[in-house]
UniProtKB/Swiss-Prot annotation:
Name the record gives this protein: 2-isopropylmalate synthase
Entry similarity comment: Belongs to the alpha-IPM synthase/homocitrate synthase family. LeuA type 1 subfamily.
Molecular-function GO terms, alphabetical: 2-isopropylmalate synthase activity; acetyl-CoA C-acetyltransferase activity; manganese ion binding
Keyword vocabulary terms for this entry: Amino-acid biosynthesis, Branched-chain amino acid biosynthesis, Cytoplasm, Leucine biosynthesis, Manganese, Metal-binding, Transferase
Keyword Signal: no
Its biological purpose: Catalyzes the condensation of the acetyl group of acetyl-CoA with 3-methyl-2-oxobutanoate (2-ketoisovalerate) to form 3-carboxy-3-hydroxy-4-methylpentanoate (2-isopropylmalate).
Annotated segments matching region Regulatory domain: 390-512
Cystine bridges: none
Every Pyruvate carboxyltransferase domain range: 4-266
Biological process terms in GO annotation: L-leucine biosynthetic process
Pathway(s) of this molecule: Amino-acid biosynthesis; L-leucine biosynthesis; L-leucine from 3-methyl-2-oxobutanoate: step 1/4
Species the sequence originates in: Listeria monocytogenes serotype 4b (strain F2365)
Length: 512
């Protein structure tokens, strides 16, 4: 039975999803959940890319105690040095170095010859090996690279000290047959194939990321890279939950085992979906809302008689608890804290007190507080506590001729209260125009989405917005409230606050 490592890049490649932007606290929260999930390696970011990314990688490296943390780096000494500095507090640091090997990338992006690429790989892998025990090399766009040159580049990296070789299907171009053959070729040509770890990194442009990752495992890969929910650039990455469950359900075929705690997938998926603002499609494999629903009468009859007739995956396997009892206003602190632990949250004593207080307020307004309500409660508490601006007052009124007016008062982190008013063609536009005046920013709303957290007339509204500022930076905001307009204002204020804070940090860096 072979052991397959899981390498999660939700915080790096996953964050490249348009409209997704995690802050430091959110990234730490995700990383801690990935640790509970049993992920072997967490790719925390690209330290050289920005001061913010450096600080995120540094914070995650310090917070994680039971798995490896890695950072991305180009074949540049400065990148490697920056990664070393960011990861110095990690219990088990690794580095991930990449350089393109396809002709189109070398000619048009790198403007380097094959000889220059090989020399760069040799030098920088050797340089990194002096600083890290585990060095992973990725020949970017491997599946469109000349096969002989790809093998030469991989051999060069191994000879220079690489301990992990990752084969990226950067643009989602390959198929399972071709990808499996590529790993067979590597196994035949690379003399140290069994002495180091080979990995796959697949994209889903043609809908084959999971199939390609499994083909790689079938043909010798011992590490799989991907993200939770398959989020990522363009069509996304390999969905790790799909690979993990496939290996478990078809252990007879793949003969593989992992460190993954399968019943933590639902918690992981829910957390990342809410923080990213990307809902999980209902028909998504493994963790979609319809994954265990049966509409056909024949199917329903079969499942009632024996679930094995139509279910190869039980809901409980991935952490879907259909029998979880809702909490109510008579539920005590112990029951609440126990449920938080079951849902995967790690809260400090003060956070527990604050969350329980909010829970009691919520329980007074709702007959039953469901697990979805609790996820929203923790998400709201986490996001609002990190905000520099808090909504204190909102008033909307009809003016004339279909025009709406809004008065908004916010409190800044230093306690200062500011208030302004504006109009718009509707309530939402009036509120957002007012917030723009208060924040003194030129903001474009690019996405607005509202959903009910639970069923019923007493459901809370959860609003997600995506905005773009005048510098082209994109920010995501979440607002939760029983009142739709208040939830909308909270979401927009949060996103605008992130934009304003980021602009201040950028200005500070320029002054430095």
């Amino acid at each position: 039975m072979k052991k397959i490592q899981f390498f999660d890049t939700t915080l790096r490649d996953g964050e490249q999803t348009p409209g997704v932007n995690f802050d430091v606290k959110e990234k730490i929260q995700i990383a801690l959940q990935l640790e509970k999930l049993g992920i072997d390696v967490i790719e925390a970011g690209f330290p050289i890319s920005s001061p913010g990314d450096f600080e995120c990688v540094k914070a995650i490296a310090k917070a994680i105690k039971h798995c490896s943390v890695t950072g991305l780096a180009r074949c540049v000494e400065g990148d490697i040095d920056r990664a070393e500095e960011a990861l110095k507090d990690a219990v088990s640091p690794q580095i991930h170095i990449f350089l393109a090997t396809s002709d189109v990338h070398m000619e048009y992006k790198l403007k380097m010859s094959r000889a220059e690429v090989l020399a760069s790989i040799k030098h920088h892998i050797s340089y990194a090996r002096q600083k890290f025990d585990v060095v992973q090399f990725s020949p970017e766009d491997a599946t469109r690279s000349d096969r002989a040159f790809l093998i030469e580049a991989v051999q060069t990296a191994i000879d220079a000290g690489a301990t992990v070789i990752n084969i990226p299907d950067t643009v989602g171009y390959t198929n399972p047959t071709e990808f499996g053959q590529l790993f067979q070729d590597l196994r035949r040509e690379i003399k140290q194939f069994d002495d180091i770890i080979f990995a796959s990194h697949c994209h889903d442009d043609l809908g084959m990321a999971t199939a390609n990752a499994l083909a790689a495992i079938e043909n010798g890969a011992r590490r799989v890279e991907g993200t939770i929910n398959g989020i990522g650039e363009r069509a996304g990455n390999t969905a790790l939950e799909e690979v993990a469950v496939a290996l478990h359900i078809r252990k007879d075929f793949y003969q593989a085992e992992t460190n993954i705690v399968l019943n933590q997938f639902k918690n992981s998926s829910d957390l990342i979906s809410r923080l990213s603002g990307m809902p999980v499609p209902r028909n998504k494999a493994v963790i979609g809302g319809n994954a265990y629903a049966h509409e056909s009468g024949i199917h329903q009859d079969g499942v009632l008689k024996n679930p094995d007739t139509y279910e190869i995956i039980t809901p409980a396997l991935v952490g879907v608890d259909k029998n979880s009892l809702p909490l109510g206003k008579l539920s005590g602190k112990h029951a609440f804290n126990t449920r938080m632990e079951e849902m995967g949250y790690t809260l400090t004593e003060q956070e527990q007190k604050d969350a329980f207080k909010r829970f009691k307020q919520l329980a007074d307004a709702k007959k039953e507080v469901t697990e979805e309500d609790l996820h929203a409660l923790i998400l709201g508490q986490s996001s609002e506590s990190a905000d520099d601006f808090e909504l204190k007052h909102l008033q909307v009124q009809y003016v004339t001729g279909g025009v709406q007016g809004a008065i908004v008062r916010i409190e800044e982190r230093d306690g200062a209260l500011v208030e302004d008013a504006a109009t718009g063609s509707g309530s939402i536009e009036a509120i957002y125009n007012t917030i723009n005046r208060l924040m003194k920013q030129d903001i474009e709303l690019t996405d607005y989405r509202i959903q009910a957290i639970t069923a019923g007339q007493d459901a809370q509204a959860e609003v997600h917005v995506v905005i773009k500022n005048d510098k082209g930076a994109v920010f995501h905001g979440i607002g939760i409230d029983f009142d739709v307009l208040t939830a909308s204002a909270k979401a927009y204020l949060q996103a605008s606050g992130k934009s304003k804070t980021a602009s201040k940090q950028a200005d500070f860096e320029e002054v430095k």
